[in-house]
Amino acid sequence: MKDPKAPIGVFDSGVGGLTVLKALRRLLPREEFLYFGDTARVPYGGKPLAMVRRFAWEIAGFLLRQGVKAIVVACNTASSAALPDLAEDLSVPVFGVVEPAARAARGFRKVGLIGTQATVESGAYPRYVDLAWAKACPLFVPLVEEGLWDDPVALLVARHYLEDAPKDLEALILGCTHYPFLKGAIGAVLPGVALLDSAELTAREVARALEAEGLLNPEGRGRTLHLVTGDPEAYRALAERLGERVEAVRRVSLEEL
């Protein structure tokens, strides 16, 4: 029997998954969280899917050893590479971010997708929604990880990637959890296009599932421990610039995974 008071594990290649963590905390204020950012190996998007799959299994195994009651793969690349196997083989509920965003896009006639090279090439999204256009945007994740989401260079890069988007595009799936931090630049290039991200929808799915399984924490204090494979203080500085209050952060060496 899983312990309702156990934490929820959330992981991403870096700070992108903080968008999902924020939505989870808003819906589940009593839950305790372990947020794992694989900052020593970010970005995932240009790496082979087999390598990303290995990373996802390493992190999921580590989180299980910390006693989590559920795992949220708050990374589109890792969700595309590993989610079906993780969900089938792990002993706790596992949630990804691909299907929730794809479901949100079904109400639009002409839908586009931007994501990492690995996510776009994986074909994960077309399993759930018809796409009129898709584009890999490999520089977007480094822009966010370097703290440049509101720098003029972000707008220049967005124009470079999005200039060939169809003029009649109705919705664009932000197929990477880093990309919501770039909504200002993306929206400036594609005014009038609905920008869809999966954070809120994923959080709702997690909340429904935990309630159905009797796993909601009745008396938690809503704390989050941040775990990173890179420099903890560099992570803290970046996360706090993104609006995340980091009360506790600890480095996890790759040898511990």
Swiss-Prot record:
One example of a Gene Ontology biological process annotation: regulation of cell shape
The chain's coiled-coil residues are none
Q: Name one GO molecular function term.
A: glutamate racemase activity
Provide the catalytic activity annotation. L-glutamate = D-glutamate
Keywords for the protein's UniProt record, in alphabetical order: Cell shape, Cell wall biogenesis/degradation, Isomerase, Peptidoglycan synthesis
What EC number(s) is this enzyme filed under? 5.1.1.3
Q: Which domain of life is it from?
A: Bacteria
- Pathway(s) annotated for this protein in UniProt: Cell wall biogenesis; peptidoglycan biosynthesis
Annotated residues that bind substrate are located at 12-13, 44-45, 76-77, 177-178
> Could you say which protein family the record assigns here?
Belongs to the aspartate/glutamate racemases family.
Task: State what this protein does.
Answer: Provides the (R)-glutamate required for cell wall biosynthesis.
| The protein's name | Glutamate racemase
**Annotated source species:** Thermus thermophilus (strain ATCC BAA-163 / DSM 7039 / HB27)
The gene name reads murI
